[in-house]
Amino acid sequence: MDQLIPVINKLQDVFNTLGSDPLDLPQIVVVGSQSSGKSSVLENIVGRDFLPRGSGIVTRRPLILQLTHLPIADDGSQTQEWGEFLHKPNDMFYDFSEIREEIIRDTDRMTGKNKGISAQPINLKIYSPHVVNLTLVDLPGITKVPVGDQPTDIEQQIRRMVMAYIKKQNAIIVAVTPANTDLANSDALQLAKEVDPEGKRTIGVITKLDLMDKGTDAMEVLTGRVIPLTLGFIGVINRSQEDIIAKKSIRESLKSEILYFKNHPIYKSIANRSGTAYLSKTLNKLLMFHIRDTLPDLKVKVSKMLSDVQGELSTYGDPLYDTKNSQGALLLQIITIFSSNFKDAIDGKLTDLSNNELYGGARISYIFNEIYSHCVNNIDPLEGISLNDIRTTMRNATGPRAALFIPEISFELLVKKQVVRLEEPSAQCVEYVYDELQRIVSQLEAKELSRFINLKARVIEVVNNLLQKHKVPTKTMIEHLIKIETAFINTSHPDFVGGEGIFESLYKKQQLQQQNHLQQLQDQYQQQQQQQQQQQQQNGINNNQKGDNGNMNVNQQNMNQQNMNQQNQSTNPFLQQQQQGQNKYPGGPPAQQQPNQQPNQLNKGPQNMPPNQSKPSSIPQNGPNNNNNNNNNNNRQDHQQGSFFSSFFRASPDPSLGQYGGANNSNNSNNPTSPINSSSNSGNNYNTFGGQQSSSSSSQQLQQSSQSQYKTSYNNNNNSSSNNSSYNRYQDDFYGRGDKLNQVPSIIKAPDDLTSKEKFETELIRELLISYFNIVKKNVKDSVPKSIMHFLVNQSKEHIQNELVAALYKEELFDELLEESPQISSKRKSCKAMIEILRKANEIINEIRDFRN
C-alpha cells in the first residue's frame, strides 16, 4: 500500500511530459476562495514555508505538489529535505525560500507580472521525513474583483480552471472554508456540490477556528450537522499574521495547534480528529485507498491506449526509402487500396460503414427509388395543357379540311410535348449520382493516402476527371431515351387505353352525368309540387275559391315550370343535347304542357294530353308506361348512341342534315304539321354517323323542311340548336355589311365556347394523353437508373484503377507525390513518444504485485 502513491507520482511525471493527463489519475485537489488559508494548510502539511505570500491573488498556476516520505537515518542524524521541479530535473533546492522564488519566476514566465493566470501546472516534488506520501493539487483561489491588469472575467477563468480538475471522477476534493465566514456562502463547497452533489468524494477543511467571535464555535459544522459530507469536516489552526512577523516556525505552530484543540472547552472532544497532522494522515489514507480501487482500471486504460496509439502509428507508416523501386511499389499499393475501397463503398462491402446514416451505394439507391421515382410519379400528364390548347391543336391539325375523325397528329403532338418534360428530372438524376460518387471519393480518406498531401490531391483530381468523362455519355443516353419515346408513338401498346375501351368509358361517364342532372330536375320538381300543396292547405281556401282560382294557379304553375325547364335547357348542355336530339330525329318534338292542364294530370296516361304531344322531357315520368312513352324512350336511347359516335366521327356538312349529319329543326318545334313532328316517323332508325335510314317520302319531307328552315334562319336569327352557333357568330360579318369582309385578325384563337361535340373530343384526347403518358413514365423510370448505373457508376468502378495508374505511375512524379506533409511527420513522432510513455506507465503499474495488502 505504501508504494501506491509513489507509483501515481511516477505516472504523473510521465504524463506531465505530454502536458496532459489522459488517464485521469487519482489525485487530491485543494479548492478555496482567496485568503481562505488554503496555502497555509499546504505549508502546514509540508511543515515548511515554501509558497508565495502577499495581498491579492498569489497562486496563479496550478501547483502539483508531490510529497515523498524519507525514512529517518538509523543513527538518528537529521535527514536533509529538498525540493525538485519537473522543469528543472537536475536541480535540487535545499533552501525552501529558493523554492518560493522559483515558483514566482516560473509563474511570471508563463503569465507575466500582471496577475494573470495560466492552466499550465507547476510540478514540485518535496522529499522530507516529516511528510507522508501524498499528492496534492493547489489551485488558484477564487476571486471576485479583478486586480491590476487582470482581465474582467478573471472569476470565470478561475472557475473554469477549477472545474476542469474537480469534475474528474478520480479527484478527491478538499474544500477549504474559513470558520469566520458563513458556510452557506462558501465558494469551495458550492463548486464541489456541482460536480459531487452527493458529497461522496468531498472533504471539508475549516480554517481559522481561533479567529471566530467569542461565544461562537464551529461544532455544528465539524460534526456535519449543517452540510453533511461522506468524508466529513476537519478543523485546523493557521499561523496568524503576528506569528509570521515574529517568524514563528511551522513546527512550533503545529505544536500550538495540538494544545489548542486539547485545551479548548468545546473542541477537546474532537481533538483527536482535528489538526493538520490528522488531516495529513486522513488525506494519505484516502488517496491510497482511492488509488487501490482505481488501479485495475488504470491498467486496462494504459493497455488500451497503447494498442490504439500503435494502430495510429501504423497508419502513418515508416519513413520512406530513397530507391525508386520502393517508391513505385508504395504508390501502386496506395492506388490499389484506394480503388478497392471505392468499389466496396459502392457495393456496400466497406467494413467501416456508418451505422447512423446511409453511405455509398445505398445513397445512390435512395436517389433512384425515392427522389427520382417520386418526382416522376408526381408529374401531371395534363400539366401545362388546357382544354383550349387541345382544341387549338386539333383544329390546326385538320388544316383547311373538316376531318371525319379526330386527327391523330394532334394526339402525337400533345404527347411529345409532355414526354419532353421527363428529360429535365432524368438529367438532374444523373447530376445527383455524379455528386454522390464525388462524395464517396472525398469521404474515403484512405489512411495510407492521408500521409501524402500531393498524392491525395492528384488522386481526387484524376477520379473527378474520370467521373466527368463518363457523365457525358450518360447524359447523352438519357437524351436518347427521351428521343426514343418521342420518335414513335406506339398506340398499339398493350397497356394503352384506346379503341373500344376509351369509348365505352366516356360513354358511361356521359350517361352518368346526364342521369344525375335529370335526377336533380326531378327532385326540384317534386319539391316544388310539395311546397305548392302545402301553401294551398295553409291558405284555407274554400271549394268555390278553389274552383274559381284553380285554373289561374295551375296556369301560373305551368308557366313557372316552363320557365324553369327553359332555363335548365339553356344552361345544361346535356339537356340541350337531349332536346335537340328529339327535334332532329323522327319521333316528335318535346311535349309541351297545355295551359289549362291541372298539376295532377301530369302523372296520368296520354289520354289526358293532345294526340300529337308527349310529356315534357324535363318532367319526371311517374305515371304508368304506354306505347308513346316507350317510343320516346327508345328514340332517346338511339339518339344518345348516335350522338356519342357522331361526336367522334365527322359527317359531311349536308345542309339538309344540319352541320354534322343531324336534321336541322329550326322553327319546327312548335309546328304541329311539320314532318318531323308527325307520328309516322317515330319508328325511323339512324346509323352511327348520324345519317337517316327511312323511306323516300319521309326523307324528301325532312329534306324540304330542313332546307326551308336553313334559309329562314338567316333572316329570323332563331337558332335553338348548338349546331348553328358558329353561323350566328359570323352572321353580321356576312349579311350586315354589304359586300365587304372584315379584316383577318393577325392572331386567331379558338372561341371560348365549347360545343358538346368539342367537349367530347377534348375529353377523349385527355384520357388518351393520361394513358399513354403513364406508359412512358413507367418506361423512363426503369430505363434511366439502368443507364446511369451502366454508363456512369459501373464504368467508373471498372476503370478507376487503370486511370490512376496511367496518370500517376511515373518515376518523375514519385518524389513529388510521395512527399510527406509536416503534420504527418509530427504525428508520427508524437505517437512514438506516447508509445514510449505508455510502456513506461505499464511497467510502473506492473511493479505493484499485491496492491490489495
Curated annotation (Swiss-Prot):
Ranges where the record places region G4 motif? 207-210
Q: Where does GTP bind?
A: 32-40, 207-213, 238-241
The protein's matches in SUPFAM superfamilies, at most eight in alphabetical order, are given as: P-loop containing nucleoside triphosphate hydrolases
* CDD domains attached to this UniProt entry: DLP_1
Any idea which GO molecular function terms this record carries?
GTP binding; GTPase activity; identical protein binding; microtubule binding; phospholipid binding; profilin binding
Query: Where is the segment annotated G3 motif?
Result: 138-141
Q: Can you supply a Gene Ontology BP term from the record?
A: pinocytosis
Q: Which family does it belong to?
A: Belongs to the TRAFAC class dynamin-like GTPase superfamily. Dynamin/Fzo/YdjA family.
Q: What is this protein called?
A: Dynamin-A
